[in-house]
Amino acid sequence: MGLTIQVGAADQVLEEDFAKVLVAVLAASFPGAGAEPREEDTWYSPELGWSGWGALQERVERVLGAGAAPHFLSMEAWFGAYLPVATEPGVLQVGDDETPFSIAALSALTEELERFGRAANLPTDREGLTRLADKYEDDDLCDDDMDLQTYAQVLLGALVARERRQPLWIIK
């Protein structure tokens, strides 16, 4: 199973019962988090190789230095969201779920990835990111540069999430 980055309401991305509880927790702790139901379609990336997230985190840390991207580096590619509100990286306990739900700020993620992109001489605009992502749709290249594929899709998703004021979901 790979990783798909998503932007949308909680009820479009998560199981219904969990989504209801999470929306209530987010509304109480982070007004304006954008997880409530909406009519907009969910934006989602193509399925990415699971190894790309960790490879990108390693590359970001190598290029920017230790501690330079705390929001991006705080999130495992498992169970969390970048929220369109000011917050520090952390975890929430949601209902009776044993797995803590990771959160970080969408604006900080976007800034960190754009700074990384500039430092690594990669595109940071939607058009350039789309071209970079499209390059890897070729069957001969689909297993190459998992970190770059992940970078393009995460930053594209972050730009969409910022525009919509919705969370960027990192959910297995």
Which residue stretches match the model-derived regions?
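Acidic (Asp/Glu-rich) sequence patches and key acidic residues
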Residues: 1-164, 171-172
